[in-house]
Amino acid sequence: MRTENTATLNLMWGALILEELARLGVQHVCMAPGSRSTPLTLAAAQQTKLKRHLHFDERGLGFMALGLAKASGAPVAIITTSGTAVANLYPAIVEAWLTHVPLIVLSGDRPPELLGCGANQAIVQPAIFANYAQQVNLPTPDAHIAPQMLLTTLDEAVANQTRPVHINCMYREPLYPSEMSGTILDSESPYLRPLQTWLQHARPYTQYGKSEQLSSPSDDAIMRFVHGKGVIIAGTLTPEQDPQQLIALAQKIGWPLLTDAQSQLRQHPAAIGNIDQLLQHPKARNLLQEADRVLVFGGRLLSKRLIAYLAEQNWHSYWQVLPQQDRLDPSHNAKHIWHANAAQFAQLNWYRSSSANWANTLVTYNDELHSLFVRNIDQGEFGEAQVIRAIANTRPLEQQLFIGNSLPVRLYDMYAPVSCCTATTYTNRGASGIDGLLATACGIAAHQGKPTSLIIGDLSQLHDLNSFTIARSLTSPLVIIILNNDGGNIFNLLPVPNEELRSDYYRLSHGLEFGYAAAMFNLPYNQVDNLADFQSCYHEALDYQGASVIEVSVSQHQASEQIAALNLWVKQS
């Protein structure tokens, strides 16, 4: 084949891939510059059905795609060139696999004759993500390979996708056509003649039925299950699962609803949100130990005390509801797992428990803790928990909340306030890394342009400074709240043998501030050390059409000392 025909066919395959992905539900494509992925890049540049996002750092790009997929509930495509560009996606792919977020990696690659021979920027890319992505290896574009094969390969890999797929795309040079004029997928092209019908409509070439394997108990099984003292636990749930239905379910059965930070229900007034603290409250814990059946929605619980409670209790019946088959119980309890959407399961024909309202006293204990937190956190010294509670109480219906790992998400889980409504809440708690948090929040903010707040620690932000580049491109409010306690102060809560080891090998104090970083990326910046200034800056930032930074300066020991003091009060209640 002449070289010009090679470039044209490369581009045509790229266009077929991007068009079919758009028909399969992809709305966003995240792209990093590179030469070997040129057929995909040029095709994406002409694809009007996809919103394009560009970033030079593939690690941040992968996490941005993760955020876009979380917020949209749809697969997101990622285009990279060959070599370590692909490897830099690994952390985001791991997180997406563990949390069932659909990402589609389209990696440009060298042809077979340039692999394993010292050719430039060539590594073994197939299976680079090991067990964390479904692998599809495309051959180099060839006129002897029917275009239908390409489409059916994509359809089989992507339809009903709930986890990452890696599609490795080999291209021979030349990669750049001599001109870019007209439509790439020209219906007059002899190569595309078998796709005339496909070109005339907007449906995928192969249309798969939904592969949902929903399961539900019989009425008799439900009646037996609710006959006793039980609890309902809301773990990690997405907004699409409509977790609000669990409130009505708990009220109908007459069992308490215990809520995790990631349930979308942590602040609901009808839920027992302070469960982490109640499990060290002597009277509350004694009451909870009377339960002999449990209904868990989702998994990946944050509270170690709640995880231990599930592990130590002698359950007569343990039901868990998950949207797809998974193993999300580190205590390995004997249980019945039902595959269903949380809202669907909550709307089954449930009966009133024979022990309805058995744990009503928990409401009193929960309210006592709420009053304690108002007195000792909201009205106490300035600190991280105070800031997090202030954020959670501000315009919850108007914004989205992304909570960073390490100390921020734990403070929210322990001390979030009760409120009439809760912001849609996101986390990265699959692998629970501190990398890519800003990039993920940028993706969440970029999908619909809804005001978004990111609560992030100083080390997490240092880990993802490059993603300020993504943040500055946003045209909707993204408030980046950096809790700067000068190091990894979650280690203050852990039993490191002595303070010298803690300081030298765990906390890693750095003495850095973020004002110059914000200035480098031309982002509005404020540094605060009291609640009044924070609230003033925060309200202003929520109205700013773009990203802005608020750095909260706190001492290394403020949060850990406050946690210890509150724990002592709760244990003595």
Swiss-Prot record:
<comment type="subunit">
    <text>Homodimer.</text>
</comment>
<comment type="pathway">
    <text>Quinol/quinone metabolism; menaquinone biosynthesis.</text>
</comment>
<dbReference type="InterPro" id="IPR029035">
    <property type="entry name" value="DHS-like_NAD/FAD-binding_dom"/>
</dbReference>
<dbReference type="InterPro" id="IPR004433">
    <property type="entry name" value="MenaQ_synth_MenD"/>
</dbReference>
<dbReference type="InterPro" id="IPR032264">
    <property type="entry name" value="MenD_middle"/>
</dbReference>
<dbReference type="InterPro" id="IPR012001">
    <property type="entry name" value="Thiamin_PyroP_enz_TPP-bd_dom"/>
</dbReference>
<dbReference type="GO" id="GO:0030145">
    <property type="term" value="F:manganese ion binding"/>
</dbReference>
<dbReference type="Pfam" id="PF02776">
    <property type="entry name" value="TPP_enzyme_N"/>
</dbReference>
<protein>
    <recommendedName>
        <fullName>2-succinyl-5-enolpyruvyl-6-hydroxy-3-cyclohexene-1-carboxylate synthase</fullName>
        <ecNumber>2.2.1.9</ecNumber>
    </recommendedName>
</protein>
<dbReference type="GO" id="GO:0030976">
    <property type="term" value="F:thiamine pyrophosphate binding"/>
</dbReference>
<keyword id="KW-0460">Magnesium</keyword>
<dbReference type="InterPro" id="IPR029061">
    <property type="entry name" value="THDP-binding"/>
</dbReference>
<dbReference type="InterPro" id="IPR011766">
    <property type="entry name" value="TPP_enzyme_TPP-bd"/>
</dbReference>
<comment type="pathway">
    <text>Quinol/quinone metabolism; 1,4-dihydroxy-2-naphthoate biosynthesis; 1,4-dihydroxy-2-naphthoate from chorismate: step 2/7.</text>
</comment>
<dbReference type="GO" id="GO:0009234">
    <property type="term" value="P:menaquinone biosynthetic process"/>
</dbReference>
<keyword id="KW-0808">Transferase</keyword>
<keyword id="KW-0786">Thiamine pyrophosphate</keyword>
<dbReference type="GO" id="GO:0000287">
    <property type="term" value="F:magnesium ion binding"/>
</dbReference>
<keyword id="KW-0479">Metal-binding</keyword>
<keyword id="KW-0474">Menaquinone biosynthesis</keyword>
<comment type="similarity">
    <text>Belongs to the TPP enzyme family. MenD subfamily.</text>
</comment>
<comment type="function">
    <text>Catalyzes the thiamine diphosphate-dependent decarboxylation of 2-oxoglutarate and the subsequent addition of the resulting succinic semialdehyde-thiamine pyrophosphate anion to isochorismate to yield 2-succinyl-5-enolpyruvyl-6-hydroxy-3-cyclohexene-1-carboxylate (SEPHCHC).</text>
</comment>
<dbReference type="Pfam" id="PF02775">
    <property type="entry name" value="TPP_enzyme_C"/>
</dbReference>
<dbReference type="GO" id="GO:0070204">
    <property type="term" value="F:2-succinyl-5-enolpyruvyl-6-hydroxy-3-cyclohexene-1-carboxylic-acid synthase activity"/>
</dbReference>
<keyword id="KW-0464">Manganese</keyword>
<dbReference type="Pfam" id="PF16582">
    <property type="entry name" value="TPP_enzyme_M_2"/>
</dbReference>
